[in-house]
């Protein structure tokens, strides 16, 4: 994985096996998300006492926070099997019907990116979630017939990074909805120490703190940075991940103290140096950094906005005062602070000018 996507919250095919090796297996091993963890524990324990599958579960939140891990944990806590698929992989209702009819009693069906499931398949899923039955249409035209098929009672765990794209009928069929939040630096340090033990990586407390501060509040990024720092420590140091080793390694990979990579800094630098801090339109900003507008909007902006370095305004993107200082630039007098004239109220009435 290159430095440009080292801090991406999305997982690549090449790192799935490595990521799985440090994934928590049980709810007690899952770090942080105390509210969600407690609620989920009540749901699962209640289902086990009754001897019936729990309500269908919807997990929402940014990528890399543990939605897939929680889906596997649900199956482990219930002592059942899990079937894993994704919304884009289910193109036809027949694909989904084949999966549903192959489930055993009490099994967990995990659909990642459930908001991207095809509409015909989604409509088939409604009856399966509510009545544990699917109607498979055989034939076409006036001669088509619907054959009802029973489905074993199961639990659907859906994961989405964009809950707003779920249709109302789909959202309403989930009996338990949980939103995962970004991790605190302290929680990420705990997670890094656990991952280091599993991977056999010697790490100091200040080394874990240094990595956690650059991980954007995301466990997947924290574990990825740990593996890259481990490589540096083994090749160019004594094998121990210390603060100094982590700083040197992440400098090589162009990840700065705030977790910004090359593209993030390019966006801020263009805003400040080329457009005097903005406002500037998204398309113009993308051209300035040599990227597609959707790359800037979907890859860079979410973290820059959350970090308080960039603001989206009706007139365009604006670099905040924190962005200027992070780049080591001094904003012109009056750019920020009490000397800035207040924004005009759209509905204010000004006296007529002579």
Curated annotation (Swiss-Prot):
The record's note on its domains: Has 3 domains, the large (RuvB-L) and small ATPase (RuvB-S) domains and the C-terminal head (RuvB-H) domain. The head domain binds DNA, while the ATPase domains jointly bind ATP, ADP or are empty depending on the state of the subunit in the translocation cycle. During a single DNA translocation step the structure of each domain remains the same, but their relative positions change.
Gene Ontology terms, MF aspect: ATP binding; ATP hydrolysis activity; four-way junction DNA binding; four-way junction helicase activity
InterPro entries hit by this protein: AAA+_ATPase (IPR003593), AAA_lid_4 (IPR041445), DNA_helicase_Holl-junc_RuvB (IPR004605), P-loop_NTPase (IPR027417), RuvB-like_N (IPR008824), RuvB_C (IPR008823), WH-like_DNA-bd_sf (IPR036388), WH_DNA-bd_sf (IPR036390)
GO terms for cellular component: cytoplasm; Holliday junction resolvase complex
Catalytically driven reaction(s): ATP + H2O = ADP + phosphate + H(+)
Protein name per UniProt: Holliday junction branch migration complex subunit RuvB
Region ranges (Large ATPase domain (RuvB-L)): 1-183
